[in-house]
């Protein structure tokens, strides 16, 4: 049975931990508000770019732009994984890494075994996980979310499009957490290249005169579209991470609160038992003196 001193030490340790988790929850909540605002603001712009691209591509031969036309055979693939830099965010990283493993080992298992699958990892957790297991990591961006910048998304998009145009890969997939609500991020494995036919469906109802030609506009629009999509995915992942961390720290704080309640009950019982024992010894000693 633990002594009063042991219980006091545990109470002190749990109280200290509770203060840390409560502070981390508050920090995550503040970061979530900013991250959510950025993600929500990026969505309409990304959606409008996709719509414009779809409207224009309906009026031209998509074979003129290789990024808009798929290939009959996938002989090489690139998987872009977006995770967090830090832990203490529940199953945020574990769940998305499982999705990435499924994509790499199941959907493109033959390409991976043949050495024709590469990865780009944005975020320390995913980078460390796949690097230690010997996967081919073309580029890693550890600690990218410490100072999230559009130039990183642009660099990733340019690398992906360059590899696709050179024929080094025939498919580019992005695996990330999409922010939907605080309690329910959505695990996504989304094709970035080739730009899917669904994205090319845009508004076909309007009849516009384009200056310069639709083909020239598409050539300018496609890189912007790719940059924006990667940036949106990184913002979504960042917001989902902060939401997961806030939820995890809230749960940890509540667990600490419940543990403190149990420890205080144990402490009071142990203290009561010690007092009862002392009283019994005093009474026993007094009886012995009287006899």
Swiss-Prot record:
Transmembrane segments: none annotated. It is found in: Cell inner membrane. The keyword Transport applies. The keyword Cell inner membrane applies. Keywords: ATP synthesis, Cell inner membrane, Cell membrane, CF(1), Hydrogen ion transport, Ion transport, Membrane, Transport. PANTHER family: ATP SYNTHASE GAMMA CHAIN, ATP SYNTHASE SUBUNIT GAMMA, MITOCHONDRIAL. Produces ATP from ADP in the presence of a proton gradient across the membrane. The gamma chain is believed to be important in regulating ATPase activity and the flow of protons through the CF(0) complex. NCBIfam families: ATPsyn_F1gamma, PRK13425.1. This is ATP synthase gamma chain. The lineage of its organism: Bacteria, Pseudomonadati, Chlorobiota, Chlorobiia, Chlorobiales.
């Amino acid at each position: 049975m633990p002594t009063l001193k042991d219980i006091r030490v545990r109470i002190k340790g749990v109280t200290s931990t509770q203060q840390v988790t409560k502070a981390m929850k508050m920090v995550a909540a503040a970061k979530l508000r900013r991250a959510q605002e950025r993600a929500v603001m990026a969505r309409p712009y990304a959606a409008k770019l996709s719509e414009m691209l779809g409207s224009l591509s309906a009026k031209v031969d998509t074979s003129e732009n290789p990024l808009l036309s798929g290939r009959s055979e996938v002989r090489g693939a690139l998987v872009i994984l977006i995770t967090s830099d830090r832990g203490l965010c529940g199953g945020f990283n574990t769940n998305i890494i499982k999705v990435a493993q499924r994509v790499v080992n199941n959907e493109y298992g033959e390409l991976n075994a043949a050495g024709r699958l590469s990865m780009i990892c944005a975020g320390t957790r995913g980078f460390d996980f796949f690097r230690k297991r010997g996967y081919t990591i073309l580029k890693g961006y550890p600690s990218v979310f410490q100072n999230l910048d559009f130039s990183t998304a642009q660099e990733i998009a340019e690398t992906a499009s360059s590899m696709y145009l050179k024929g080094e890969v025939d498919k580019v997939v992005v695996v990330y957490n999409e922010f939907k609500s605080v309690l329910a991020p959505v695990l996504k494995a989304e094709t970035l290249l080739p730009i899917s036919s669904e994205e090319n469906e845009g508004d076909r109802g309007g009849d516009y005169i384009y200056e310069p030609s639709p083909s020239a506009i598409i050539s300018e629009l496609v890189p912007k579209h790719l940059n924006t999509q990667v940036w949106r995915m990184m913002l979504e992942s960042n917001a989902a991470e902060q939401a997961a961390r806030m939820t995890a720290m809230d749960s940890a704080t509540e667990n600490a609160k419940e543990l403190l309640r149990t420890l205080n009950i144990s402490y009071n019982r142990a203290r009561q038992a010690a007092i009862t024992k002392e009283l019994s010894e005093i009474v026993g000693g007094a009886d012995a003196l009287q006899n």
